[in-house]
Amino acid sequence: MPGTVRPGEPVQVAIIGGGIVGVVLAVGLIRQNVKVRLFEQSQGFREIGAGIAFTANAIRCMEQIDPAIVTALRSSGSVPTSTGDEKDPNDYLRWIDGYNLHREDDPYYQRMLYKINAGYRGFEGCRRDQFLEALVKVIPPEVVECKKRLESIEERGLEEKLILTFVDGTTVEVDAVIGCDGIKSRVREIILGEGNPASYPHYTHKVAYRTLIPMEDAIKALGEYKAKNQHNHVGPNAHLIHYPVANKKMINATAFVSDPNEWPNDRQMVAPGCREDMEKAFAGWSPCVRNVVNLFPKELDKWAVFDLWDYPAPFYNKGKICLAGDAAHASSPHHGAGACIGIEDALCLATLMKQVNVSVQASRVSKGKALSAAFETFNAIRRTRSQWLVNSSRRVCDFYHQPEWADPAKWVKAETCFEELKDRSYKIWHFDYDEMIKETLKSYSNREAALLQESSEGSVEK
């Protein structure tokens, strides 16, 4: 009958959202012979032209999902964000004093506060839009449908197909839904409930201004070494981070400023901004920082930084519906790892969907039960780590914005944060994804065994 899941049929999954995590997941599921349909609400793929960086670990996860993803990343102009020099090919994260002038005779001089070795190609940076453009080419065009804003999901029973209704009135039937629709996720609102504070993001009281700057201009502003390597300039109530992108032809620069006020509209996270406001926030900072600020456009967007920390999602799954990436655990960007954690999600889900296919094709368990067990497994494996990131990203921004940076008598106190920052960074960089895969397979297998036992006992009773 129409709408009923037939045993042995290939699993059909709808991915809601065409951001980086949604597209990476689509590539991974296609590789595992899962029938995928990807629905994006905008007319095209929505990433802006700002920079993004991936850890070496996240890139290895991409390789596990499908090597074509790494090929797309490299073809989009990704470069190591922070190699020191020819003698030392490793990447480093650097925190420098962005506020105080330490040498009157050399305005370019800034005191190095801390440096962490991220290893060879520890971070690779690129433009978001260029990576996504290269990534989309990996997916068959018939998989993607744009201008599809999700309105509702109708659940009619575990062994019945889900009915997706879009704002344009069209409907689609699928076996499962994975919401990768970002921080303002409609899928999250559906499974957690309208009006539930956990369904919506909340303001972190930080705003961001970002731009791309030609490398030659960046060198004039910062000096060659700082321009060609990642640096994070910290100071009271603000910080500025930059790193090279586009084959080192540009730098991606983002300024974050603390804001004690409430954001006026939590449905609209972007507002018109101006360089004059940035200049006020960074008045009195080091000449290098002010030089970079002067290279931002006079008129530009001001991005409110929202996240899901105040009211974390209590679960990522409901039946045959699941959340991944920012839809599940949108964090502030201060670890630079939100997308990396989303890539880990995609690897976990691709692993699970492969097992679901095996279970269904072998007729061990029904498709509905297999999918539900898979999403329960995903929730168990991924929620704790991903929620930790949301918390930790808030924590490290507090380090960067300490008022103590402005008081020389309290510099030693302020600098005690860096050992903790190193530990937090290592937790992200040195994640054992092989162990995650093993735990995922074991957890799913245990759930499947419990379902088989339950089915066997039910047959005996009959």
Curated annotation (Swiss-Prot):
It is a single-pass membrane protein. FAD binds at E40, A53, R128, D326, A339. Disruption phenotype: Increases the production of DHMBA completely loses the yellow color and instead produces red pigments. Impairs sexual development and produces very few colorless but fertile sexual fruit bodies (cleistothecia) after 7 days of sexual growth. One of its GO terms (biological process) is pigment biosynthetic process. It is found in: Membrane. Pathway: Secondary metabolite biosynthesis. Its main location: membrane. GO terms for molecular function: FAD binding; monooxygenase activity. Pfam families: FAD_binding_3. Belongs to the paxM FAD-dependent monooxygenase family. This is FAD-dependent monooxygenase dbaH. It comes from Emericella nidulans (strain FGSC A4 / ATCC 38163 / CBS 112.46 / NRRL 194 / M139). The gene is dbaH.
